[in-house]
């Protein structure tokens, strides 16, 4: 029982709770507010959280298949409560952020609907016999939501090799403090040529 509830807690935290913030950040990008690296970091973060949730869901479903007798109506109710609380906390966080000013073309109500849709999608992936936490929520999807669940084709800067952009960037006379100093290019050539 403890493993099931612990895995569920993490699925809710990583798979629902922070997605209201992701939605707000993605919405800002629609109006040229967080571009370039900021945009990529949000996409990588969402991809990372999706991978965590996929793994946690797999673990939970395996736990349930190996120990089917541990599911009881009481545990199902605890799981439903966790999902509902996660949506409630995500909405509360969005409301807190909106105290500083609302975002263009994104209301608190839209964030709440999105989080409820997400909770429904996440719980449907669990093998507990529940299709939706919020069965009456709208089926209309916000257009910007797809970015959060797209498989990223971007190269994560933590995974990519470094690129040296400094070649030829300095002009004029430059005196190196050490007469034996070699540039990166010179060192590479020395290593390659033996």
Give the ranges of each region predicted by the language model:
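Non-heme di-metal
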Residues: 1-194
């Amino acid at each position: 029982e403890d493993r099931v509830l612990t895995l569920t807690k993490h699925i809710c935290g990583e798979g629902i709770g922070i997605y209201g913030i992701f939605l707000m950040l993605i919405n800002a990008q629609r109006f040229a507010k967080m571009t370039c690296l900021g945009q990529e970091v949000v996409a990588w973060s969402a991809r990372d959280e999706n991978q965590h949730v996929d793994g946690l869901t797999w673990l939970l479903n395996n736990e349930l298949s190996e120990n089917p007798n541990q599911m009881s109506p009481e545990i199902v109710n605890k799981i439903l409560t966790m999902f509902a609380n996660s949506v409630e906390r995500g909405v509360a966080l969005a409301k807190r952020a909106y105290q500083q000013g609302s975002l263009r073309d994104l209301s608190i109500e839209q964030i709440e609907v999105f989080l409820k849709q997400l909770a429904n999608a996440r719980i449907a992936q669990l093998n507990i016999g529940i299709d939706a936490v919020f069965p009456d929520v709208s089926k209309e999807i916000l257009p910007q939501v797809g970015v959060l669940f797209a498989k990223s084709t971007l190269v994560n800067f933590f995974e990519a090799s470094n690129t040296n952009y400094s070649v030829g960037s300095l002009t004029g006379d430059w005196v190196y403090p050490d007469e034996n100093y070699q540039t990166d290019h010179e060192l590479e050539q020395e290593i390659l040529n033996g």
